[in-house]
Amino acid sequence: MNSLHAHLLLLAVCCVGYIASSPVIGQDQRSGDSDADVLLAADEMADNGGDNIDKRVERYAFGLGRRAYMYTNGGPGMKRLPVYNFGLGKRSRPYSFGLGKRSDYDYDQDNEIDYRVPPANYLAAERAVRPGRQNKRTTRPQPFNFGLGRR
């Protein structure tokens, strides 16, 4: 019984494969016209002599490998399109306008507390004048350091 099922399954698979590969009824059946067109176009390119370089480059540039970036500039020779590195390597940060190493915003400057002991001649009036700012140079880096040096 199992061998009968195996033979029927094999027959069914063959029938499905035949039906799937057969052309659709009512569709125009071309008897190799597309192959003839390709060969005719290739013969025309061979007749033109050296003018077929541009067509050949366009024909074989499918987007694979080096030929994906080739194009002609209208004259003799070929140029290569620029290859853009999208964030790979050392300059992976998209917008670094020279802010340098001190451009990290991982802290809140308003909540910064200076834990150093104030000097003995520290005036309370100075604190009343500038309550938010404890010291000109803080212990953490400033968010915008444009390389002006120390002041």
From Swiss-Prot:
Main location per the UniProt record: secreted
One Pfam family hit: Allatostatin
GO CC annotation, single: extracellular space
Region (Disordered): 131-151
Signal peptide extent: 1-21
Gene Ontology process terms (BP): negative regulation of juvenile hormone biosynthetic process; neuropeptide signaling pathway
Tagged with keyword Iron: no
Alphabetic keyword roster: Amidation, Cleavage on pair of basic residues, Neuropeptide, Secreted, Signal
Sequence positions bearing Leucine amide: L64, L88, L99, L148
Subcellular location: Secreted
Listed transmembrane segments: none
InterPro entries referenced in this protein's UniProt entry, alphabetically: Allatostatin (IPR010276)
Propeptide: 22-54, 103-135
Keyword Secreted in annotation: yes
Domain of life, source organism: Eukaryota
Gene Ontology terms for molecular function: hormone activity; neuropeptide hormone activity; neuropeptide receptor binding; signaling receptor binding
Function: May act as a neurotransmitter or neuromodulator.
Family listed: Belongs to the allatostatin family.
Name of the protein: Allatostatin-A
